[in-house]
């Protein structure tokens, strides 16, 4: 199109790539809000600018494939989208160029202003300097005026000669006729004075010319049009016996004759002096020419010597054959002296630094020796340290010697049917009053919940079983110490991260105390029961759907999403995804053993869930499947059909009541100081009946409950609730009940 810039090459260098968006819905509401005729009529460029981003990222691929049959029209749409993307990239590039040029323009304007200001200041300084120069020159020119006439003289000697010759009193004629020697002396002094005065005048003229030339050069360089004020030239009057006739009495003839003779002598003297002056000038010219010729010859010799030295350096003779000139020797001597001085100074500084370092190390070593002495004294007199046992957060399946696999399964089934279910299938943990134990230290409780989606299988029912870890028996003759593992670190980190969400949704979990049966199991001798100093907190609030929705909204708001918006844009989704991945990578770096613990927990859960039943239980499960927990009878089913039960269901319900009674009795026995629980012999048969019985009994529902909306089935929850002494939360719930 005739543009000067190569925009395709520039766009390719920036790394821009064309993209075709296929995933995602089209915003038909936004496109419906645009009125093309009105935009054309009003020339609404702002609305078109807003629509550019949506048009460039609209997923046209799937829509064009399904809605437009003509491939040419589809290509027009796709090429228009590519063109929009390309033009948007060019616009961003040009915008950046314009901003850079504006910044450069502003900086250039500022520099021009500063330069103009500095130029005006420099011009003012030049003018002031010219004024000062003129003042100094005027001060340096010392003038000696005559007090008897209007003439001025340069030196005091010239003024005295002028007064002695011009303004002296007339002498008698006998004195005027002096000898020839005196006349010769006067002539010599006059010639000398004239020559000195002329030389001073020439020097002054040359100085004035030099000053004028310097001013012109400065004015041309600065470009200032101001003309420096011209200095007034002062003329010096030369006074001698040869220039003017002496004033004598006109009445005496002798005076006239003497004046005539003097004038003749003055004329002859002046002619001689002029000839001498001309000869002196010619001699000066010749000497100057000879001097200039000598200088030129020397310059030619120097240039010739420089050329020879260059040629000699080009031939690169060995360094040993070269003879150092006096200048080079002086430079080498100066350099060696400087290097020696620098070496001395640096050595002195290094000695000071080393001395300071040695003193610091000596002080640190003395402090370390004192600390080691203190530690050795403390080791000599050790104090008994009370170890506070902390419950391990790693779910490790440990089977007691007295307890078999059947007992563990029995406890799991009992705890399953004794738990209370809420609307959102969460379980609240209540704290029981604490019994007396061997040591009055607080026991920490860990709770690990592994939530998995329910996967239907042939042998499993749709109920939500809760598997608990088998109670763990601590070693009787070993002190319990803190167990810090990678699982505890990772779980503690997760708890600190989700502290705000937990505080808004539910209260902090209370510690579940241990029962006195475990203490009795370790030591059969009765112990004194000490009252616990803990305050019983209110039970935890269950997490409902409303709370979960609030928690999700809060999380989304923290990431910058608006709750009023109906969807999440692709860019914001990418941004949040990148932020979460960065956060996850940071957590991976902080807790490198997190995945190891997760795999360990998974293996433990799979091991628990893959417990095999006996052959009789498997046969019963094959012949009869349990009912669903949320199954509700229809309106057309009569109450007689609902109330009818099979003999096996009645037997199973009776077996459940018996197991409940036995669990209550066993709990009462555990509360008593008896050492062991009573285990029934016919538990195996009763367990098989419990496994075959339905998970929930069918009851008649009211009309309001039947007409209400169906509740979706919750996901399966697997909970590992253990305390330090091996008891589970289910045992503590049984104690409370």
From Swiss-Prot:
Keyword list, A-Z: Cell projection, Cilium biogenesis/degradation, Coiled coil, Cytoplasm, Cytoskeleton, Metal-binding, Zinc, Zinc-finger
Output the superkingdom of the source species: Eukaryota
Task: Spell out the Polar residues composition-biased ranges.
Answer: 457-469, 665-677
Database matches in InterPro entries: DZIP1_N, DZIP_RILPL, Znf_C2H2_type
Q: In which tissues is it expressed?
A: In neurons of the second and third antennal segments, expressed at the tip of the dendrites.
An example of a Pfam family matching this protein is Dzip-like_N
A GO CC term? dendrite
Which parts of this protein are zinc fingers (C2H2-type)? 144-167
What segment(s) does the record annotate as region Interaction with Rab8?
1-293
Which residue intervals are annotated with compositional bias (Acidic residues) in the record?
492-510
Biased composition (Basic and acidic residues) is annotated at 244-266, 415-438, 724-737
Similarity comment text for this entry: Belongs to the DZIP C2H2-type zinc-finger protein family.
Query: What name is this protein filed under?
Result: Cilium assembly protein DZIP1L
Give the source lineage, highest ranks first: Eukaryota, Metazoa, Ecdysozoa, Arthropoda, Hexapoda
């Amino acid at each position: 199109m005739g543009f000067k810039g190569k925009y395709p090459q520039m766009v390719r260098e920036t790394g821009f790539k064309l993209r075709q968006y296929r995933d995602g819905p089209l915003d038909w509401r936004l496109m419906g809000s645009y009125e093309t005729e009105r935009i054309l009529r009003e020339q609404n460029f702002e609305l078109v600018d807003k629509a550019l981003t949506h048009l460039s990222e609209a997923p046209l691929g799937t829509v064009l494939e399904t809605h437009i049959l003509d491939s040419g029209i589809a290509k027009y749409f796709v090429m228009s989208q590519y063109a929009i993307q390309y033009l948007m990239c060019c616009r961003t590039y040009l915008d950046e160029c314009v901003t850079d040029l504006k910044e450069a323009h502003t900086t250039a304007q500022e520099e021009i202003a500063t330069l103009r200001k500095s130029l005006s200041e420099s011009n003012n300084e030049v003018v002031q300097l010219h004024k000062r120069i003129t003042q100094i020159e005027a001060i340096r020119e010392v003038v000696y005026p005559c007090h008897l006439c209007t003439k001025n003289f340069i030196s005091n000697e010239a003024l005295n000669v002028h007064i002695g010759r011009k303004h002296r009193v007339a002498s008698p004629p006998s004195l005027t006729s002096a000898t020839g020697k005196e006349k010769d002396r006067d002539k010599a002094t006059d010639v000398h004075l004239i020559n000195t005065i002329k030389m001073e005048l020439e020097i002054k003229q040359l100085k004035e010319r030099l000053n004028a030339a310097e001013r012109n050069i400065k004015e041309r360089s600065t470009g200032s049009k101001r003309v420096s004020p011209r200095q007034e030239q002062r003329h010096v009057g030369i006074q001698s016996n040869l220039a003017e006739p002496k004033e004598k009495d006109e009445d005496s003839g002798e005076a006239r004759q003497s004046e005539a003779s003097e004038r003749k002598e003055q004329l002859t003297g002046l002619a001689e002096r002029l000839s001498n002056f001309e000869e002196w000038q010619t001699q000066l010219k010749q000497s100057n020419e000879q001097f200039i010729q000598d200088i030129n010859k020397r310059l030619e010799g120097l240039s010739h010597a420089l050329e020879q030295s260059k040629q000699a350096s080009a031939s690169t003779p060995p360094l040993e054959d070269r003879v150092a000139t006096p200048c080079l020797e002086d430079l080498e001597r100066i350099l060696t002296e400087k290097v020696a001085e620098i070496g001395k100074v640096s050595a002195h500084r290094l000695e000071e630094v080393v001395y300071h370092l040695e003193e610091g190390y000596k002080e640190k070593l003395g402090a370390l020796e004192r600390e080691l002495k203190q530690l050795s004294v403390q080791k000599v007199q050790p104090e008994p340290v009370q170890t506070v046992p902390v419950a391990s957060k790693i779910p490790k399946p440990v089977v007691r010697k007295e307890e078999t696999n059947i007992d563990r399964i029995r406890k799991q089934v009992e705890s399953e049917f004794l738990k209370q279910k809420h609307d959102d299938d969460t379980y609240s943990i209540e704290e029981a009053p604490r019994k007396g134990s061997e040591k009055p230290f607080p026991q920490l409780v860990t709770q690990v919940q592994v939530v998995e989606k329910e996967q239907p299988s042939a042998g499993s029912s749709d109920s939500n079983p809760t598997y608990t870890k088998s109670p763990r028996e601590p070693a009787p003759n070993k002190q319990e110490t803190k167990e810090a593992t990678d699982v505890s670190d990772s779980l503690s980190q997760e708890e600190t991260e989700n502290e705000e969400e937990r505080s808004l949704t539910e209260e902090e979990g209370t510690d579940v105390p241990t029962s006195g049966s475990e203490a009795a199991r370790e030591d059969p001798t009765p112990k004194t029961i000490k009252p616990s100093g803990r305050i019983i907190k209110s039970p935890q609030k269950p997490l409902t759907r409303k709370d979960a929705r609030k928690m999700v909204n809060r999380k989304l708001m923290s990431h910058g999403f608006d709750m009023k918006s109906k969807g999440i844009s692709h860019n914001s989704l990418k941004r949040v995804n990148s932020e979460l991945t960065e956060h996850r990578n940071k957590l991976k770096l902080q807790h490198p053993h997190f995945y190891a613990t997760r795999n360990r927990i998974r293996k433990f859960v799979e091991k628990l869930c893959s417990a095999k039943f006996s052959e009789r239980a498997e046969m019963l499960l094959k012949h009869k499947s349990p009912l669903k927990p949320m199954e509700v009878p229809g309106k057309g089913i009569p109450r007689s059909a609902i109330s009818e039960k099979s003999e096996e269901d009645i037997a199973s319900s009776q077996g459940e009541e018996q197991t409940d009674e036995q669990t209550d009795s066993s709990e009462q026995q555990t509360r008593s100081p008896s050492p062991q629980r009573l285990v029934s012999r016919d538990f195996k048969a009763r367990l098989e009946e419990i496994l075959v019985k339905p998970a929930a009994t069918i009851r008649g529902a009211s009309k309001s409950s039947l007409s209400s909306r169906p509740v979706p089935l919750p996901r399966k929850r697997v909970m590992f609730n253990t305390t330090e002494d091996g008891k589970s939360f289910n045992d503590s719930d049984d104690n409370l009940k």
